[in-house]
Amino acid sequence: MVKLIYILWAPKGQPSQTTRELLLNKIQPRLYDAGVKKLTIYIDDEFSNVRSSAPKLYSGPEISAELSLWVDNVERHLEIEIILQSGLFTYAGYVVEESIYTEYGGNKHFHKRDWPDGQRSPVLMAITLMERPQKLSREEWIKRWHGTQSPVSEAMQPRARYIRNVVLQALTPDAPPFEGIVEEAWPSVKHYTNPFLFYGAGKMNVFKLAANMYRMLRSVSAFLELNKIRSSTMSEYILKS
């Protein structure tokens, strides 16, 4: 099977609750009719409206949702896009190669998944869209992301799940030039908004916090331009696993 990711922007001014209901109640069943075999939707809704402890330098429009889906043939994207158009979404589609670095229950920070398909996951999601700096070859960029940043962040941060998606191909005209899409689950809002938890600095250890922030900044800036990192908090709905 092939994994596709669609980044969605809802019509300007549309309430997040309307976006969620449209995606879950109307778009979801039609996607199965279009041949989608597995589906997770990440939605910027009222349950995920929080600020990160990480600095945010990008000031462009926030994304409304991400569709993460599996199909048996990439040509299915044409049917999928007709469905998205019916919801009046602006969208960008990509073929990706997924690698799960940490699964639910894969570390001490969270338990194995024990909730059913269709129920909102008891975590806070962070979806990050990444562009490769032109000064780095694609090979070197992936090496720094997978070989350095992933283990550095895993050792430091209390994530529940970490999925890396390397973009293989853009499906839609004028799609932003993202080459990586990260799906991170955090055990709670507090783990994402409290800098001491977010950076693995323990209980109010300001020296460890400063050291870890510096280490993270060096690791991230070695493969990304900070002002181009787009990160959004979302709710996760695993709909068909």
Where are these regions (language model features)?
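Macromolecular interaction modules
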Residues: M1-S241
